[in-house]
Regions:
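One-carbon transfer enzymes
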Residues: 1-167
Length: 167
């Protein structure tokens, strides 16, 4: 199993979701901390300003479907663009390409009656469910399978959020 840490950000809800999934024992580090001894760093809200670390895999959660809508205010960009499907992307952060290989994506529909706050809330819900499960697959050296989203399998009494135990 890979040793990983979360890089702190203002996105406390996703940090809490990751901690909950893994039983609350995952280190939360600051950008200036030493990353020695970690195989994986999990970003929780950084844009392309985060610099890759030698010999450490880095992943990020992006609140739209890449490769569309990169940079600042991507949620607003996606919502105002008129797209009917947006979503969440989990991607690798690579040395010369912050938006590296896409590891997983999950759609969020934007209907005619969807307002911006509902859209943002749905993006956050999907991110809190998808990201911990992708992290779990990476640290256990398995390929992420979307069926995992619908089956129990996390560390809290064997459930991934589909029952009353994880509410």
């Amino acid at each position: 199993m890979k040793n990983f840490a979360i890089i702190d950000s203002e996105n406390k809800e996703i940090i809490t979701a990751i901690q909950k999934h893994f039983g609350g024992n995952i280190p939360v580090l600051s950008v200036g901390d030493s990353f020695e001894g970690y195989d994986l760093l999990v970003l929780t809200g950084y844009e392309s300003s985060f610099q890759p670390v030698e010999n450490v895999e880095i992943i990020n959660l992006h609140p739209t479907l890449l490769p569309s809508f990169q940079g600042a205010d991507v949620l607003k960009q996606a919502f105002l663009s008129g797209v009917k499907v947006s979503g969440i992307t989990v991607h690798k952060v690579e040395k010369n390409n912050f938006y590296g290989k896409i590891l997983a994506q999950y759609p969020v529909l934007i209907g005619a009656a969807t307002n911006f706050s509902d859209y943002v809330e749905e993006i956050e819900i999907v991110g809190k469910k998808l990201y911990p499960m992708v992290i779990d697959s990476i640290i256990n050296d398995r390929v992420f399978d979307f069926h995992d989203l619908f089956n129990c399998g996390c560390s809290k009494n064997g459930c991934s959020g589909n029952c009353g135990n994880c509410s």
